[in-house]
């Protein structure tokens, strides 16, 4: 790395950190238990890591996004991500790194406008460390646990509420959570009295895990099948 490039990166990080420090007046605890100072009001954000942009889209905060990872700009014959289909404008945004959380601090610092906060779903074995990313960019990095609608539902809800608080979408976060809970309850109510012998046998293919996979990618404990009391072939092939 040449000296001018190092100087450019250092100066940008310093200037961004000054702006973040001046306006950071709200301290939050993120998904990794880190205490993070974030601006009280945020207009621009980016989402890093698997599923992160999906959660932000649930909150209808898509207009705040100023950059995406390279996954969002890829064109395929079939896109299995409903949020991306609903918002094709993501494809036109600047790229700040590679998918699965492999961010590029230099590209982040060239985004215009600059993000006030970086949301990041994080796994220790994959992607840029949130603390290191924050140190190199001077931008608050809020780590999130993606969770699911099964045993990790509380983590999903906590992440939605945290994102909602930072983006000013608290009411929307609660509406999304209420929708999930009401729908799950209704599905269970409708199917709980179906005799065991009459319950359908089903299989789910093409499950995405930290990115898209083929048809044979499945989930033995797929929560929606559990909600309707269906027999999941991947869980009980007999």
Where are these regions (language model features)?
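Solvent-exposed loop/turn segments at secondary-structure junctions
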Residues: 51-54, 71-74, 123-126, 147-152, ...
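A short, structured surface patch at a secondary-structure boundary
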Residues: 49, 53-112, 116-123, 230-233
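Structural recognition of the beta-strand scaffold that forms the well-ordered cores
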Residues: 46-48, 66-69, 116-121, 141-145, ...
């Amino acid at each position: 790395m040449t000296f001018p490039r190092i100087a450019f990166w250092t100066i940008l990080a310093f200037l961004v950190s000054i702006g973040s420090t001046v306006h950071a007046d709200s301290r939050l605890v993120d998904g990794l238990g880190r205490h993070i100072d974030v601006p009280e009001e945020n207009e621009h954000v980016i989402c890093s890591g698997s599923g992160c942009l999906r959660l932000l889209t649930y909150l209808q905060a898509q207009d705040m996004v100023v950059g995406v990872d390279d996954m969002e700009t890829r064109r395929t014959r079939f896109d299995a991500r409903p949020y991306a289909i609903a918002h094709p404008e993501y494809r036109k945004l600047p790229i700040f790194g590679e998918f699965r959380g492999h961010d590029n601090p230099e590209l982040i610092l060239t985004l215009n406008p600059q993000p006030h906060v970086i949301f990041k779903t994080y796994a220790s074995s994959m992607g840029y460390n949130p603390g290191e990313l924050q140190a190199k960019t001077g931008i608050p990095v809020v780590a999130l646990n993606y969770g699911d609608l099964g045993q990790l539902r509380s983590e999903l809800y906590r992440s939605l509420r945290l994102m909602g608080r930072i983006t000013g979408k608290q009411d929307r976060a609660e509406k999304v959570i209420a929708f999930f809970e009401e729908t799950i309850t209704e599905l269970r109510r409708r199917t709980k009295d179906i005799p065991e012998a009459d319950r359908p046998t089903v299989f789910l293919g093409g499950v995405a895990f930290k990115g898209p996979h083929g048809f044979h990618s499945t989930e033995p404990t797929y929560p929606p099948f559990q909600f309707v009391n269906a027999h999941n072939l991947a869980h009980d092939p007999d």
